[in-house]
Amino acid sequence: METPSQRRPTRSGAQASSTPLSPTRITRLQEKEDLQELNDRLAVYIDRVRSLETENAGLRLRITESEEVVSREVSGIKAAYEAELGDARKTLDSVAKERARLQLELSKVREEFKELKARNTKKEGDLLAAQARLKDLEALLNSKEAALSTALSEKRTLEGELHDLRGQVAKLEAALGEAKKQLQDEMLRRVDAENRLQTLKEELDFQKNIYSEELRETKRRHETRLVEIDNGKQREFESRLADALQELRAQHEDQVEQYKKELEKTYSAKLDNARQSAERNSNLVGAAHEELQQSRIRIDSLSAQLSQLQKQLAAKEAKLRDLEDSLARERDTSRRLLAEKEREMAEMRARMQQQLDEYQELLDIKLALDMEIHAYRKLLEGEEERLRLSPSPTSQRSRGRASSHSSQSQGGGSVTKKRKLESSESRSSFSQHARTSGRVAVEEVDEEGKFVRLRNKSNEDQSMGNWQIKRQNGDDPLMTYRFPPKFTLKAGQVVTIWASGAGATHSPPTDLVWKAQNTWGCGTSLRTALINATGEEVAMRKLVRSLTMVEDNDDEEEDGDELLHHHRGSHCSSSGDPAEYNLRSRTVLCGTCGQPADKAASGSGAQVGGSISSGSSASSVTVTRSFRSVGGSGGGSFGDNLVTRSYLLGNSSPRTQSSQNCSIM
């Protein structure tokens, strides 16, 4: 086909060869040729425009169809993501409330721990003070015992001296008795001498009377004779008689005076000797009595001091016994508190270790999810580039956040793990349900499976021969313990059945050892039942373990942004067909009403299972999330079943709202 530009030189060449042209003609011809060229170009342009419009119409039709398909897919994904975001917001709210409550409980526990620690420190100070006081009292007791031993030795010495003094007193009393006897003898002799003196005086008077009578008789005879004698010789006889009488009287008086003097001298000498000996004896007796009195006074004072010391010693011993009893009680209390604190600390360490393990597992899951989200983001970006679609600002923002998060995860994985550990919390709690229909109740069940404790709460003895304790953990085989045929549980008594692995001693009727079983078993759902001899269940206790996990709101918001980014993306195969893209969905059972909440979007193809287990003190939600993407043969497609993860969320406090006020319904 010949173009107008190819035809124009031929025509102009022919005209130029036929006739000469004027400049005006030439100018017009050139303008004509220019117009023809422009017309040809316009025709070609119009043809091209028409063909392009036809192609554009076809493309618009295809674009419209593609946009309708994409809008349908995006609307479905958006609905699913909005439902998912609603559930996530509710979960975040509940998790935030639970975290606040757990923080309050943690602060209370820390305050209690500080208070108990302060009390323990105070008790230890009191114990040290009591020990110091005990040492002082022991030193005082030793000094008092030394003083008592000294007083006892002095008492023994004084008792020896008293014994010697008593011997001396006995000797002196014997000497005094002998002196008294001698004094009595001397007094008897004096009385005898006085009697003799009186007798001699009476004899002397009698002799005087006799002599006077004889003298009168002689006088009378002489007078009668004188009458007869001469008066001349009367005076001679009278003078001679007077002289003889005077001489006889003088002799008698001299003899009596001499005898009297001898008696008085002998009596006075003996009396002086007796008085001197009596004075000596009385002085000795007085000294002995005085020494005896002083000894008695000293013995009385020492006895009073000894009794006072004995009373003080008894009081000190009673006080020492009281202090020892109080010290023993304080030691027992301190040991019990320390044992409880050590047990609580061991439990807290075990729980912390368990939580750290769970945190590590959750971090690993989070890292895997971050890698999968990053891979999904790359796939979506590849599809957008292939379809030449401009990314939304949210996608760009999410892509920037994902790139920064990826760099942080690659460059500082330990920092991310540490931040995750600090921004999330997990707690394991146990809830117990007990029921009793008889006298005996299941009082305590060990979480580690070491023992089962029963108590007779009635005022009567209970025969438990051939009774059974049945223990089961979830779907595990049933464990049965049978009591001895003659076993009886006293009123108010407690019996503990130990597993053989607990290391307890068999001491009936308070401690029994199940030698056939090393442990009672441990797990998340322990049911212990007491069966009587007729096969009737009279008591039951169920122990349920719940795990509570709380994550920081910032991390959840980042996950929400990543989910929003996934909502706004789309996947297509290389041939233009939409790929099946199954993101997250969740099925949750209400802990109060028990009804499921179906929030999965239609056409998403996600299959997620969840359940809630609620007890008297804790509730938990197990959420399983599945991701599946089936792409075409494009370079950005993935295989099936990328990841399936299970999470355990929960609230340690029981739900108090009714089914009408259920947040899910």
From Swiss-Prot:
Region ranges (Tail): 384-665
Residues recorded as bearing N-acetylmethionine in the entry: M1
UniProt-annotated stretches for the region Coil 1A: 34-70
Site positions per UniProt: Heptad change of phase: T266, E330
Ranges where the record places region Disordered: 1-27, 384-442, 552-577
Residues annotated as domain LTD: 428-545
Residue ranges of the propeptide: 648-662, 663-665
Residues under site feature: Stutter: D325
Site (Cleavage): residue numbering on this chain: Y647, L648
Superkingdom of origin: Eukaryota
UniProt feature, compositional bias: Low complexity: 395-409
Region feature Interaction with MLIP, mapped onto this chain: 1-130
Protein name as it appears in the record: Prelamin-A/C
Source species of the chain: Rattus norvegicus (Rat)
Lineage, highest ranks first: Eukaryota, Metazoa, Chordata, Craniata, Vertebrata
